[in-house]
Amino acid sequence: SLLKLRNTTKWWSKKEVEQHKLDYVLDCIYRSPSKQLKYNFKVLIFDETKKCKQIKDWLYWEHTYCLNKIRGAKGNGLRRYNGQVLAPIVLAWASEKNDLEVIEDIMVSSTTALLAAEDIGLNTGFNGCLESRELGQKIGETHVHMLLGLGYADKIDTEPTRKVFKDGVEMGYDLGNGVQGERINNSIGEYYGR
């Protein structure tokens, strides 16, 4: 099945995402369902331009990391980073609202994008470890609720983590490109009332 081979990708190759593949993913987003056809969000594309790379670097080094299991915590210690935000293409779902209806629509839309991307051979990595208003203000939006990295994995890891270095100094780690979450939720497929 499509998702059986899927990995959460956090480490990316330099291979560019082909325009026709990005167009296909965007078309699938355009066609995804929305409650009462409201579509109270927009999808922004962060590519490899200088301005976009600056935002992605800020996301990685300053905004989405976790220290002691707290996003953006200050202090000493090794941090867990979120390499999904360094993908060659990062899609961002932005909205003026911060309510459940909009977030549910964004979840449907972003999952549609993930499935479309995986279907055509792209690797993907969701990231929701962010503060929606802070990120929104950084890019001129009210809120950003979800990020999805698209590209090609540099490799599939056999180890669960990789060390992260900046200027030769170990800063922390990130999960490797491997299957995460497989068979963790054992509550799927229960029939009601049986």
Feature-to-residue mapping (PLM):
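Acidic, surface-exposed loops and disordered segments
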Residues: 1-194
